[in-house]
Amino acid sequence: MSHNTFGHLFRVTTFGESHGVAIGCVVDGCPPMLPLTAEEIQRDLDRRRPGQSRFTTQRQEPDAVKILSGVMPHPGTGEQVTTGAPIGLLIENTDQRSKDYSDIKDKFRPGHADFTYEAKYGIRDYRGGGRSSARETAMRVAAGAIARKVVSGMRVRGALVQMGPHKIDRDKWDWDEIARNPFFCPDKDKAAFFESYLDGIRKSGSSIGAVIEVVADGVPAGLGAPIYAKLDGDLAAALMSINAVKGVEIGAGFGAAALTGEENADEMRSSSSDMGNHGPVFTSNHAGGILGGISTGQPIVARFAVKPTSSILSPRKTVDRNGAETDIFTRGRHDPCVGIRAVPVGEAMVACVLADHVLRHRGQVGAS
């Protein structure tokens, strides 16, 4: 199985399965002399960790990360810093229940990657989905914590802005509210609604989808490249690679199709400071901070749609490996809305793409 690596200069390779001994990643290309501790990575992992509320899977994984390589004490200060060597990270799996999946080892679960993995490789890991499980995304979050070190002047934040058909009130957006509720929701009133709404979904044994928005502030103008190395193209690919994601948009996205040219084009005004260093002032941001594949200096805004968790309690019709029709009953522990824990994953992927483009920009034009 190839294609377990993404990035060009800031490269992340993940490995491990949902019910294997451990999951891990190797981050290659991280610059040296950046302060980095396991505790800093752990803070990001704890935001994604399962079992923290009744609204996520009850699989109890501490997700305790170990740094295996790529760091050492600074020769002068003693502070742990990166060395420029590949950074190896490992998380041991501790709460697998593979027996929950024994009844479906020969059946294809609707909405899952069971059939497609079998069709491609002739074998699949039915125990929690193997590589196709969202368990893999823990290592993306760990890599994202390192990426944030590379782009320390930028701030990457995500929020759940829609659950099912219910959208937040953008006039009530409060970034501080995200840490106060289990949904990463910036709208206090809608977070209270989501609690009762998702309780009903959860108790019925069903699931629901969500839309996540990630905003990156402090991104300088000039990151990215034309045609085949567009910043928005890489962001879209990175976000689409997340489990259960079925759509990505940048800025106005699909909404731009309903706008006129006058409405969509972000007008510019002269800034009071040196244009060469700071650029113009934009009167809107329908472009989502990217034009021609290159950042404008405005906040980068990306949204992605997460489908409902395919593992639900109601019986479904399917076929087995022999092509015979059969019923399937899903057991195990699953998220009623996998979009909740996708928020820190989306942040991590955006941070990794930005780190990669910072290093590529530095290599091409010599700028820091």
Swiss-Prot record:
Catalytic activity: 5-O-(1-carboxyvinyl)-3-phosphoshikimate = chorismate + phosphate
Keyword Amino-acid biosynthesis: yes
Keyword Translocase on entry: no
Keyword line: Amino-acid biosynthesis, Aromatic amino acid biosynthesis, FAD, Flavoprotein, FMN, Lyase, NADP
Binding site for FMN: 131-133, 243-244, 292, 307-311, 333
Co-factor remark: Reduced FMN (FMNH(2)).
GO cellular component: cytosol
PANTHER family: CHORISMATE SYNTHASE (PTHR21085:SF0)
Subunit structure: Homotetramer.
HAMAP family: Chorismate_synth (MF_00300)
Name of the protein this chain belongs to: Chorismate synthase
Organism: Nitrobacter winogradskyi (strain ATCC 25391 / DSM 10237 / CIP 104748 / NCIMB 11846 / Nb-255)
